[in-house]
Amino acid sequence: MGKAGKALKQVLETYNISQNRLAVTMGVARSNIHRWVNENRDPVAEAVLDIRKALWHINPDAAGDFIRLYLDDLEEKLQE
């Protein structure tokens, strides 16, 4: 658990995006973002796409990094 959360946490920190800003952009409760970032819960596949879309509206580079980090981590898990 946590591959999306790790990627999201890194991107939010790198691009100085608050959890609240992402939540407002996505139209979800900040508690959802908090759970993902703290790896208490993984977002479902649709939410991963919604995260990417919201990040794109905030900063396109952040969206690209999120997907790259998420997929790189996923690829590593598949190779284990």
Language-model features, listed with the residues they occupy:
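A short, Lys/Arg-rich alpha-helix, primarily the initiator
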Residues: M1-Y15, R21, T25, R52
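Recognition helix of helix-turn-helix/homeodomain-like DNA-binding domains
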Residues: G27-P43
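Conserved N-terminal glycine/acidic-rich loop preference
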Residues: A29-S31, A47, Y70-E76
